[in-house]
């Protein structure tokens, strides 16, 4: 099982994109080099979409840093099938909690946190 992190924004400014690359590099993935937009890393190798595949501990650290920077929003595909968007107004440690989700917690978060959007991905192939 692996986890995908998708960072999205309607407009991804150059400095924000560069900051993302620096953060990801700190967490042990390869730098995509200058001019590459929305880099995608699978097991440390650069791909072409706007997702990152990282180990869970790296994701927790990355999401905390991203949220603390006050960026637009975070998408974290958890255990392949759950997509959770965590907005900057919630910085109370919920990010780490979301990385340990199960079905009951998904329902609880959806009911109690209006800034959490959850959708189910059924078409993600773990072998891709």
Describe every region a protein language model picked out:
Residues 1-128:
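Acidic (Asp/Glu-rich) sequence patches and key acidic residues
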């Amino acid at each position: 099982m692996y986890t995908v992190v998708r960072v999205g924004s309607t407009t991804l400014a150059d400095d924000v994109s560069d900051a993302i690359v620096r953060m990801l590099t700190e967490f042990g993935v390869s730098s995509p080099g200058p001019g590459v937009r929305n880099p995608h890393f699978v097991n440390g190798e650069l791909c072409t979409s706007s997702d990152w595949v990282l180990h869970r501990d790296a994701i927790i650290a990355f999401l905390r840093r991203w949220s603390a920077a006050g960026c637009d929003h975070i998408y974290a595909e958890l255990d392949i099938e759950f997509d959770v968007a965590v907005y900057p107004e919630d910085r109370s440690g919920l990010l780490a909690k979301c990385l340990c989700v199960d079905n009951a917690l998904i329902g609880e978060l959806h009911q109690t946190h209006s800034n959490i959007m959850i959708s189910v991905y059924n078409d993600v192939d773990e072998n891709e």
